[in-house]
Amino acid sequence: MTKAISMDALLSPWVDCPSLASVLVSELELDSRKVQPGTTFVALVGHVVDGRKFIASAIEKGANAVIAQACDVKAHGTIDIIDDIPVVYLDALDKCLSEIAGQLYTYPDMKLIGVTGTNGKTTITQLIAQWIGLVGSKAAVMGTTGNGFLDDLKEAANTTGNAVEIQHTLASLAEQQAQYTALEVSSHGLIQGRVKSLSFAAGVFTNLSRDHLDYHGTMEEYANAKLTLFTQHQCAQAIINVDDEVGAAWAKQLTNAIAVSLAPTTEFEHALWASQVAYAESGITIRFDGQFGEGTLHAPLIGEFNAANLMLAFATLLSLGFDKSDLLATAAQLQPVLGRMELFQAEHRAKVVVDYAHTPDALEKALQALRVHCDGQLWAIFGCGGDRDAGKRPMMAEIAERLGDKVVLTDDNPRSEDPVLIVKDMLAGLSKPAEAIVQHDRFKALFYALENAAPQDIILLAGKGHEDYQIRNGETIHYSDRESAMQLLGLSS
């Protein structure tokens, strides 16, 4: 819960400032536009914006004090007074902000589960939260599709919020009696120290494939960022997908690792594996074995990667002490996650599957998963984001051509880039570019596919998933793949 504490106590042991003992802090805010009278403004030097530029604006809005990032070590601990408002400077504020916020916002009895990896974070966090609810406890999520309880998610700007938002949200969820919270932990969030002070009852690694190289530079640096969840944070259990090459290496290094695999394995001391996996229209059935004993798990999900997601969620809950028989009895009630391999179908029409796949690996796994269920032709409709890693554009096109029967190239979020040039990059990955359909309007792209597809065909509409917007030329407009699918198939929302 949130409590008001003195600035002196809040900043201890980083700064000794007894002169600020009378300044009470009850709310921290990094966005000067959201400052209200009595709020304490945090002026952080971010990756793009220097929050110190907005100190005057925050004071004008009624900030009772400012905690600002110092220019250097010499300025650490200095205090300025601006319009009677104290501004205290801390060196490396970005590195200790999570811990500072943790001293203000507390949630003593809640267990945290951190999920990291390129793909699968949203699905696993939501499966965990659903499952915990089905067996009678209360769980929330924090991540891409929002923060809160699954029936009342609040929109989130980033996969992993800033250090203050995270602590504030966790305290709020604890006040609403959340016993567990499953958090998506991005590589950005780990590198920037946003979850530094959190104590995780379990950490989960899904997989590693090409993404965010515009930020990390190399795959090695990207992998190292993910690894810090297990090596530089408090993490009691490490649930690791060892079918991923990187995960297999980590599981051999981490003493608290539980290896999870879709194939029998004897390499790891602690493991849960599938001895048999069956895929059907009704979902996935897994025969499992390992340190938690054996049994059969069935859930109404589609595809091999969802089998991996399901096993990782299952292993996590078993490691936290949930009863195996209770989990097995409720698994059939698990629901597919919004915009994640979400099926839309109408009589005598091709099936449409909406998925968030926006990396080469995710697109490949989505198409492979659907091929098992497809009796006709498999269509791939997708685009690539602007102002992001351009190297993956031809890679994704090559995957779509290789694994799909029909390829439709469209726009994702072009942002400030010319959509024509983005598609040109994608076409470079095709061996037969003349056979691809180019339709920049996503709604029209799906309309074209549905008009030309047979009832036994499956159309994968990839890239946006749960999102209900599109970004082009600096403008955010309303658009939803899910709404497009429902409208074109004549389904009610």
From Swiss-Prot:
GO MF term list: ATP binding; magnesium ion binding; UDP-N-acetylmuramoylalanyl-D-glutamate-2,6-diaminopimelate ligase activity
Post-translational modification comment from the UniProt entry: Carboxylation is probably crucial for Mg(2+) binding and, consequently, for the gamma-phosphate positioning of ATP.
GO cellular component, one term: cytoplasm
Enzymatic class: ligase
Pathway(s) served: Cell wall biogenesis; peptidoglycan biosynthesis
HAMAP family: MurE (MF_00208)
Positions with a binding annotation for meso-2,6-diaminopimelate: R388, D412, N413, P414, R415, G463, E467
Domain of life: Bacteria
Modified residues (N6-carboxylysine): K226
UniProt cofactor(s): Mg(2+)
Any one Pfam family match given in the protein's UniProt record, by short name: Mur_ligase
Name by which UniProt lists this protein: UDP-N-acetylmuramoyl-L-alanyl-D-glutamate--2,6-diaminopimelate ligase
Residues engaged in binding ATP: G117, T118, N119, G120, K121, T122, T123
Record keywords, A-Z: ATP-binding, Cell cycle, Cell division, Cell shape, Cell wall biogenesis/degradation, Cytoplasm, Ligase, Magnesium, Nucleotide-binding, Peptidoglycan synthesis
Locations listed in the record: Cytoplasm
InterPro entries in alphabetical order: Mur-like_cat_sf, Mur_ligase_C, Mur_ligase_C_dom_sf, Mur_ligase_cen, Mur_ligase_N, MurE/MurF_N, UDP-N-AcMur-Glu-dNH2Pim_ligase
UniProt GO BP: cell division; cell wall organization; peptidoglycan biosynthetic process; regulation of cell shape
Upper taxonomic lineage: Bacteria, Pseudomonadati, Pseudomonadota, Gammaproteobacteria, Vibrionales
